[in-house]
Structures are given as structure tokens and as C-alpha cells.
UniProtKB/Swiss-Prot annotation:
Modification after translation (UniProt): Acetylation at Lys-251 impairs antiapoptotic function.
Sequence similarity: Belongs to the API5 family.
Extent of motif Nuclear localization signal: 454-475
Subunit note: Monomer. Interacts with FGF2 and ACIN1.
Ranges annotated as biased composition (Low complexity): 462-472
UniProt protein name: Apoptosis inhibitor 5
PANTHER family to which the protein is assigned, alphabetical: APOPTOSIS INHIBITOR 5, APOPTOSIS INHIBITOR 5-RELATED
Residue numbers of Phosphoserine PTMs: S462, S464, S469
Residue span of region Disordered: 452-504
Organism: Pongo abelii (Sumatran orangutan)
Annotated region described as ARM-like and Heat-like helical repeats, given as residue ranges: 1-360
GO biological process, one term: apoptotic process
Any Pfam family hit: API5
Amino acid sequence: MPTVEELYRNYGILADATEQVGQHKDAYQVILDGVKGGTKEKRLAAQFIPKFFKHFPELADSAINAQLDLCEDEDVSIRRQAIKELPQFATGENLPRVADILTQLLQTDDSAEFNLVNNALLSIFKMDAKGTLGGLFSQILQGEDIVRERAIKFLSTKLKTLPDEVLTKEVEELILTESKKVLEDVTGEEFVLFMKILSGLKSLQTVSGRQQLVELVAEQADLEQTFNPSDPDCVDRLLQCTRQAVPLFSKNVHSTRFVTYFCEQVLPNLGTLTTPVEGLDIQLEVLKLLAEMSSFCGDMEKLETNLRKLFDKLLEYMPLPPEEAENGENAGNEEPKLQFSYVECLLYSFHQLGRKLPDFLTAKLNAEKLKDFKIRLQYFARGLQVYIRQLRLALQGKTGEALKTEENKIKVVALKITNNINVLIKDLFHIPPSYKSTVTLSWKPVQKVEIGQKRASEDTTSGSPPKKSSAGPKRDARQIYNPPSGKYSSNLGNFNYERSLQGK
């Protein structure tokens, strides 16, 4: 093993040789042997090996292996020095191997070391993006779980920081191709991260790019399979996939496949859905997703059949007044509960799809069925008016901080929900029923559109989902509020707001 003095002497030989460096193979070999020495020798070797690496292609394997030994040394300062110099080895055919090594080194728990690995990966990314991706995806597909997890997170956080000259169209195509391989077997969280990666790619922000992403999500959602409402994994997969698809839909990228699947497979099983996460109102969650998608549904093969399924489900949440109930169960003083949150979603979805078959209520339903529906609408509208008056009175004069209390936030959302339902019911009371009104769903931010300005939706929307979806159902950007459905205003004649919030 060479001493510190011998290392310096051989370094001098190589440094003085200028253009004839490659003739001093023995001197470079001495430096390579420095990795077998003590702390001082290793530290010098970590600096000297990369400095002259390019002059000795025949010793490339030995040099990379020597540096790799130093990257795994027990001394953290030696590891850091060795990692810092790794990009100097990333030349030609060696680059994918260096990328592979750096990807494996992402598993370190030392924060300074981890940052060095990230910086080194970014450095070689700028030298050869395709080669670096080869190393990263190799570990994602075949590496240990911790390496796979961190490599995916590296891509999801760092790709967007790279300039366009690095992320060329060819590079983005490679990312898409390799991602498709990974998506054949991913966890829920990994799927969300890959959708974030892919939807952020410039080449996939066109109409055709968005369509490709929707098809990827549809494949992941397994829309060809029969839905199993009692399997929490099946339910969770559908929810996660649909959440990723929703921000991709636009007037040019249709949600038809998803809406059809929800109408045919999910709505009939709404009451038997198994929630994948404790505390989640799974039925309301499904109905909200359906409502959001319904705006972008294209031509549907079985429109009348699916509209009828949606209509029948809506009727379940729009009760007859007590005196009109056929079985008498609701007779007497007890008023049926009005589940405003559910009705907003179902009525909105029906209103959106109804536009495609405007004579559904008048030509497709028999007179008795239509009369029954009008009675239910009228009863619900009456309850709405009572509730809206109560809410407006409760919020009257409140501004700024006063509106930020938890109680008032609930009232504000409740007012949005009831106003939306009110507008939609008025449309359906028209003769013939109208489908012209536009409302913003209560949990969605109101979009202000300047006159003459295009809505910033369609093909330029940011690819990353507006929700920070984790493996579970939590979502950030939506600021989703689950009102205590079924607990809002029960007794129309004797309204008690505070009691309606019990159980929240």
C-alpha cells in the first residue's frame, strides 16, 4: 500500500507529464492502490483518481471500482469526497454505470451525502440525459425498495428543474417509454408520482399528450374489469386513478370512458362500497369525482341507459314529502333528511349528461314518473329555501376573520351547495326542462375569466395534478370539504342549525 509521500510523488509524475500522461500507467496504478491505505491515503486517492481517469481508458473499470470502494467507506468525509468526484468518471460508455452507482447511493441516510448524490446526478444529467435515465430506470425496475423509492422521488422533484435543452423531445419520449414499463407494477403512491412526472413533460401537455396520459390512467384503473365494491384495493385503485385523470380532462380530452364506468359499475353499487381509508365518506367521494368528470364527457354509446341509472340514483336522495310517501314510513311529524352534498353531485352530473339528451325527462319517462320527479324537486326546493334563508341570516354582516372560523366556513360551503342545487332545480322546472345554467361545484374554486380570454384549462393546464395525492385519499389543492351529508336541515318547519352539525 502506498504512503502519503508515494501518492504525492506519483501525482507529481502524472501532473508534470502533460500530454504524455497516458504513458505513466504505473504511477496511476499506485494512486489506485491508495484506496487500500489509511484515512489520509484514501482521502488523497479520492481526489487524484478522477483527476487523471480520462487518460487511462484501459484502467477505467479498476478506477471506477476503486472510487466506488471509497464511496462506501466507513469514514463519512471520505465518502463525501468520493461521491463529489464521481461525475468526472461519467464519460462515454461509463456514464450509465456511474448513473447506476449514484442511484444506488441515494439510499444514504446522511443528509449532506444525499445532497451530494443528488447534485452529482443532476450534473451527469446535463452531460447525457439518456444515459443518466438508463441508470435511474435500471434501479427503479430492478433495485432494492429503498433505492427504487428514492429514484422515483428524484425524478418527480428534479426533472422539472432541468432546462429545455436537457429535456429534449427524445429524452421525454424515453421517460415515457421507461415509465410505461414501471407502471406495469406499481404501488398507489408510485403511480401518483409517475403521473406527476409524466404530466409535467412538455411533450405531453398537448391534446394528444393529455389523451395518452388518460389512456395510461384508464389502463391502470382496469376499466375493462368488473368493479368489486367489497374489495378495498379495487375501490382505492379506482379512486386514485380517477383523481389523477380528472385534471387531464378538457373539452378536447374526454372523460367518457370513466363516466361510463362510474354509471354502469359504480353507481349501482354505491351503497355497498368498502372504504379503503377510515373516516372517508366513500359515497360522497365517488359522487364528487363523477360530478367533476361529467363536464367533459363526450358522446356516450349507452347514454339513455346510463342517464337512467344516474336519474334513479338521484331519486334515492330526493325524498317524497311525508304525506306523499307510498309506504307511509315518513308519515307523521318526522321529515326526511335532505342530503344536500350528495344531491349537488348527482344533480350536477344529471344536468351535464342531460344536455346530451334534452328530451330524457319529457320523452323517455312516462307521465307518472315525471310527475313523481317534479313532486320530489318541489319538496326539495322548499327545504332549500328554508335552509338558504337560515344560512344567509347566520352569515349576514360577517366579513374577514369572522368568516374564517370553522363554524362559518361550514356555513359558507353549505350556502354554495344549496345555491347550486337551487339553480339546477330551477332549470329542471322549466317546460321543457332546460340545461343552460352554469354552476361551479361547491368544493371547486371559482374561475374568473376575462372577456375575450380563453379559459386556462384545456391543453395548457399544468400536468401535475392539482391534488397532492398520496397513497391515501387526501388531496390538497381541492381543499375538499365533506359536509355532514344527511345531517343538514332535517325539520323544515322547525330548523335548528346547531343540531344539524352534530356528528361532524
